[in-house]
Amino acid sequence: MPSVKETLTLLLSQAFLATGSPVDGETVVKRQCPAIHVFGARETTVSQGYGSSATVVNLVIQAHPGTTSEAIVYPACGGQASCGGISYANSVVNGTNAAAAAINNFHNSCPDTQLVLVGYSQGAQIFDNALCGGGDPGEGITNTAVPLTAGAVSAVKAAIFMGDPRNIHGLPYNVGTCTTQGFDARPAGFVCPSASKIKSYCDAADPYCCTGNDPNVHQGYGQEYGQQALAFINSQLSSGGSQPPGGGPTSTSRPTSTRTGSSPGPTQTHWGQCGGQGWTGPTQCESGTTCQVISQWYSQCL
């Protein structure tokens, strides 16, 4: 299986044969990388895909033509038979690792791309763990280090958490009416080193990120706060982050918020997911790329 370097070498060789002139390898890499890439992570029991994070993911794609996106592949389970009976704790551990691996790997391949994270419920929790560190002892994560590399943290320009079980009142990035905490709350006084990049949405009636009793509230953040989240994301992206219509790589399909995973097409595009436990999308990569295993939960076309 060829590495990214070997693939690049092949591309450079083809370019030289076609033009008769040497080609700058760094230029080729930059042309293949999007200006903005969005990671989405779904809520518990939802089939592989974006789940309810799709609302904000789509808003970013529509606002910034050329933006690409991918959904984190992880169990998103809480012990239910529909998702394989995997415990919530194991799902969070696997999801946190999968999120960190996907983000770190993408940044290594595209160091100049601006990254946006959009997580919903358990999906917010795994991004919270990956970006902020601090461990998650309630779910079995005792290592308090931030699992993202320093470069990847710098590349993450905005993170949107909706219905995050790690919510606790008083965090500087909280938005909404909740004045208590979620069922797996951060400890009092917790400080996230990337606080300025985050907005976390939670209302008082939510039984998961707060202490309410209305599950419908938990599912409504995209509609209630989607435009507000987009405005924050736009403010965080650099002025040169967006590409004009028709410029740069584009997402082959818009994510949907349905309860079933969506397939980007018969073959996956460069940087897209192509495998991992629970993945139901395409496993063949477009010409010039191969499906490389990053973790048990995530493989990528490189």
Swiss-Prot record:
Bilayer-crossing regions: none
Coiled coil (UniProt feature): none
InterPro entries per UniProt: AB_hydrolase_fold (IPR029058), CBD_sf (IPR035971), Cellulose-bd_dom_fun (IPR000254), Cutinase/axe (IPR000675)
Catalytic activity, as annotated: Deacetylation of xylans and xylo-oligosaccharides
Disordered, as annotated region: 236-273
GO molecular function: acetylxylan esterase activity; cellulose binding
Glycan-linked positions: 94
Domain of life: Eukaryota
Active site (record annotation): 121
Primary location: secreted
Annotated localization: Secreted
EC number(s) stated in the UniProt entry for this protein: 3.1.1.72
UniProt keyword annotations, A-Z: Carbohydrate metabolism, Cellulose degradation, Cleavage on pair of basic residues, Disulfide bond, Glycoprotein, Hydrolase, Polysaccharide degradation, Pyrrolidone carboxylic acid, Secreted, Serine esterase, Signal
Region forming the signal peptide: 1-20
One GO CC annotation: extracellular region
Chain segments carrying region Linker: 244-266
Regulation: Inhibited by phenylmethylsulfonyl flouride.
Domain CBM1 positions: 266-302
Pathway: Glycan degradation; xylan degradation
UniProt modification remark: Glycosylated.
Xref: PANTHER family: ACETYLXYLAN ESTERASE, CUTINASE RV1984C-RELATED-RELATED
Function, as annotated: Degrades acetylated xylans by cleaving acetyl side groups from the hetero-xylan backbone.
Protein family: Belongs to the cutinase family. Acetylxylan esterase subfamily.
Protein name: Acetylxylan esterase
Source species: Hypocrea jecorina (Trichoderma reesei)
Lineage of source species: Eukaryota, Fungi, Dikarya, Ascomycota, Pezizomycotina
Gene transcribed to yield this protein: axe1
